[in-house]
Curated annotation (Swiss-Prot):
This is Tol-Pal system protein TolB. The gene is tolB. Keywords: Cell cycle, Cell division, Periplasm, Signal. Belongs to the TolB family. Part of the Tol-Pal system, which plays a role in outer membrane invagination during cell division and is important for maintaining outer membrane integrity. Its main location: periplasm.
Length: 402
């Protein structure tokens, strides 16, 4: 059982640095300049400052603009906004100007003061779309994080991608491996223990209630959900031997996909029609990534790089994985590849880079970076060739999903 858990659990330290974002730019592309103007008249100075900083960071992370403080307004974009607060309700008006004329205007209302980061993210996402620039539809999506709270106890929290907003959703006992259950992010799956037996639950965020899906001896973890949310890939070990299973939520039918005497875990759908699955296996004597058709039990090796590839995430025909570097002690880097090509792209350069997860549009990858005694949540903008880091102040991370 210890060997099974070891391939899943990686515990990270906490970062206490003060920088809200570190921008690593690997491209010399000249971007249009944009000026941020805050016309708000808020008495809450902390909210005013934090909201402004999030807007600026969002515009940077979008990789569509160069944010400048002092420039000629007539020759650059202007992001002009007014934020108002009335009790627990926020209202926001945003105008995008260029060349002295309005290019777009949006008005938003939010009930729930603590969720103000999502209001900022939504406004930047909509403004980018209105200008016809490279979309950032993932920006207001939520991240699920399982973190240790005390000995043999862990919480599942929901956060925005900057980690400014954090809310505990599931608490009490050992709660592990959260996985979003639909693209609307209204439900997720997670593993907990029911009378010492690993059990998979579904949590409905609309009702704030959890319901039991299935249980198994050894372990049970939901690692992926298909496009329409009707099927799960589940790692189960009813006889202390982990394999990948397909679970149909409509028919309640459970199908074993792998049957290997070693370890097969972390199944992910891949391909435009979800007809294949990639997973991590030790059938070569070390963790590596394999693929097989859903209607076949014949697996083929996918990754021929590295000798410890123990984490994978997929988007259509692409996959990202974390790989231990052979000649660099403790260094794990993230790589991107397609199942239709031999080309592999290295996305990180140093430290321990773990838990890669694709955004909903495949254009960004979130991961956890551990370097020395510090850790951060990283966002890779793949096409822009940029990486942004946000300090982790959430405790020891067990797993994440985006």
């Amino acid at each position: 059982m210890k060997k099974i858990v070891a391939i899943f659990l990686v515990f990270l330290g906490s970062l206490w640095a003060e920088d809200p974002v570190i921008d690593v730019v690997n491209s010399g592309v000249v971007l249009p300049k944009i000026i941020v103007k805050d016309n708000s008249n808020l008495s809450d100075e902390n909210l005013k400052k934090s909201f402004y900083n999030i807007i600026v960071n969002d515009l940077k992370v979008s990789s569509n603009f160069e944010v400048v403080a002092n420039a000629t307004e007539t020759s650059n974009y202007i992001f002009e906004y007014t934020l108002n607060k009335n009790g627990n309700t926020l209202s926001l008006n945003v105008k995008i100007k260029a060349g002295g004329s309005d290019k777009s205007e949006q008005t938003y209302t939010l009930n729930g003061l603590e969720q103000y980061p999502f209001l900022a993210h939504k406004s930047v996402k909509a403004s980018v779309n209105a200008l016809g620039l490279a979309p950032v539809d993932w920006m207001d999506h939520k991240i699920l994080i399982a973190r240790n709270s005390s000995s043999k106890k862990s919480q599942i929290i929901m956060a925005d991608y900057t980690l400014t907003y954090q809310k505990v959703i599931v608490d009490g006992g050992l709660n592990l491996f959260p996985k979003w259950g639909n693209k609307e992010q209204t439900l997720f799956y997670y593993t907990a223990y029911d009378h010492d037996k690993p059990t998979l639950y579904r949590y409905d965020l609309n009702t704030n209630k959890a319901s039991k899906i299935l249980s198994s001896g050894g372990m049970v973890v939901a690692s992926d959900v298909n496009v329409d949310g009707s099927k799960l890939l589940v790692t189960m070990a009813p006889k202390d031997q982990p394999d990948v299973y397909l679970y149909d939520l409509n028919t309640k039918n459970l199908t074993q996909l792998t049957n290997y005497s070693g370890i097969d875990v972390n199944g992910n759908f891949i391909g435009s029609d979800d007809s294949k699955v990639v997973f991590v296996s030790d059938r070569l004597g070390y963790p590596n990534i394999f693929m097989q058709d859903l209607n076949s039990n014949s697996a083929e090796q996918v990754v021929f790089h590295g000798r410890n590839n123990s984490a994978v995430s997929t988007y259509k025909d692409f996959l990202v994985y974390s790989s231990r570097e052979p000649n660099q002690a403790g260094v794990f880097n993230i790589y991107l590849m397609s199942i239709n090509s031999d080309y592999i792209r290295q996305l990180t350069a140093n430290g321990k880079n773990l838990f890669p997860r694709f955004s909903s549009d495949g254009g960004s990858i979130v991961f956890i970076k551990y370097l020395g005694a510090q850790s951060a949540l990283g966002v890779i903008r793949v096409n822009a060739n940029k990486t942004f880091y946000f300090p982790l102040r959430v405790g020891k991370i067990q797993s994440i999903d985006w």
